[in-house]
């Protein structure tokens, strides 16, 4: 497949939501289906490829460039490794804490990969991106017109939904100039009350779909302890099949939309409606009250 025809997707989500775990398990399932895949990790934790490679952390492009003095002194084989089902794996890396911008590492890595032929003979390139905030750096795959399909990993928890709405706002900012579209919300379950209904409602408000609900299963943690995807660790498990279903949905997805992010007040109203957040009236009764003093509401 020519570079022009490669589908470039990105997984965004707040820290701790299970974004990297969800993306790697889904991409492993896609690779099982014969898709040729390159993962570009864009998270400073450099954990976007560890399950594919059975490793703690891959050497990053930015770290090696700093050691050598320039990215031109790196060989592609040093930073692009092959993992489960021949998935190609790269970590862009990030700056030292408090110094520089994450976007520098991301765009340096992407340019280096393109210039050295890493995007040849691929069906998908996947960017795994931190999404607590969509600052200029972490929005780089969108800003530069690389990622065209965005999938947001979220859950029925308030901060995960808040981050999802912020990410949708970032997608909207570049939708008309770069052609990026929102492919859907992936609900990585936290077993909160009415979680499926809540995320489906949020998806409609954002003009997108809940593309899949991934149930919570301890087998995911068992696989992670072994630095493996569920599809490799327990290929016959129900959870592995869930990732295969999600993988097929992404492969077949034509529902790519310009998102309609909502205001904070509307998000809070939605959370109140589903019992995630207390109403102002109830909150006023609770603020400053100890466990023994607080009224039951």
Curated annotation (Swiss-Prot):
Assigned EC number: 1.18.6.1
Post-translational modification (record): The reversible ADP-ribosylation of Arg-104 inactivates the nitrogenase reductase and regulates nitrogenase activity.
Pfam families: Fer4_NifH
Requisite cofactors: [4Fe-4S] cluster
Lineage top rank: taxon: Bacteria
ADP-ribosylarginine modification, residue list: 104
Catalysed conversion reaction: N2 + 8 reduced [2Fe-2S]-[ferredoxin] + 16 ATP + 16 H2O = H2 + 8 oxidized [2Fe-2S]-[ferredoxin] + 2 NH4(+) + 16 ADP + 16 phosphate + 6 H(+)
SUPFAM superfamilies in the record: P-loop containing nucleoside triphosphate hydrolases (SSF52540)
InterPro entries tied to this protein: NifH/chlL_CS (IPR030655), NifH/frxC (IPR000392), Nitrogenase_Fe_NifH (IPR005977), P-loop_NTPase (IPR027417)
Catalytic EC class: oxidoreductase
NCBIfam families named among the record's database cross-references: nifH
Function recorded in the entry: The key enzymatic reactions in nitrogen fixation are catalyzed by the nitrogenase complex, which has 2 components: the iron protein and the molybdenum-iron protein.
Subunit record text: Homodimer.
Identification of the protein by name: Nitrogenase iron protein
Natural source organism: Nostoc commune
Gene field: nifH
């Amino acid at each position: 497949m020519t570079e022009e025809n490669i589908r470039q997707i990105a997984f965004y989500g707040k820290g701790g939501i299970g974004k990297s775990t969800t993306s790697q398990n889904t991409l492993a399932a896609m690779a099982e289906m014969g898709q040729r895949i390159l993962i570009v990790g864009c998270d400073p934790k450099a954990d976007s490829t560890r399950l594919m490679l059975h490793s703690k952390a891959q050497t990053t492009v930015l770290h090696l460039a700093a050691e050598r003095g320039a990215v031109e002194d790196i060989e592609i084989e040093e930073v692009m490794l092959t993992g489960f089902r021949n998935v190609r794996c790269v970590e862009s890396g990030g700056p030292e804490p408090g110094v520089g911008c994450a976007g520098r590492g991301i765009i340096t890595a992407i340019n280096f990969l393109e210039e050295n032929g890493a995007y040849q003979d691929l069906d998908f390139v996947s960017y795994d991106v931190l999404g607590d905030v969509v600052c200029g750096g972490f929005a780089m795959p969108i800003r530069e017109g690389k990622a065209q399909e965005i999938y947001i990993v979220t859950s029925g928890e308030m901060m995960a939904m808040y981050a999802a709405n912020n990410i949708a706002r970032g997608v909207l900012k570049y939708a008309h100039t770069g052609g990026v579209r929102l492919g859907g919300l992936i609900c990585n379950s936290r077993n909160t009350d009415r979680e499926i209904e809540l995320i489906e409602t949020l998806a409609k408000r954002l003009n997108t779909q809940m593309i899949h609900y991934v149930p919570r299963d301890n087998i995911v943690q068992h696989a992670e302890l072994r630095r493996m995807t569920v599809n490799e660790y327990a290929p016959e498990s129900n959870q592995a099949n869930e990732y295969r279903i999600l993988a097929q949905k992404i492969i077949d997805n034509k529902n790519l939309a310009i998102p309609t992010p909502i205001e904070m007040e509307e998000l809070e109203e939605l959370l109140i409606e589903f019992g995630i957040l207390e109403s102002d009236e109830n909150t006023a009764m609770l603020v400053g009250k100890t466990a023994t003093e607080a009224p039951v509401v």
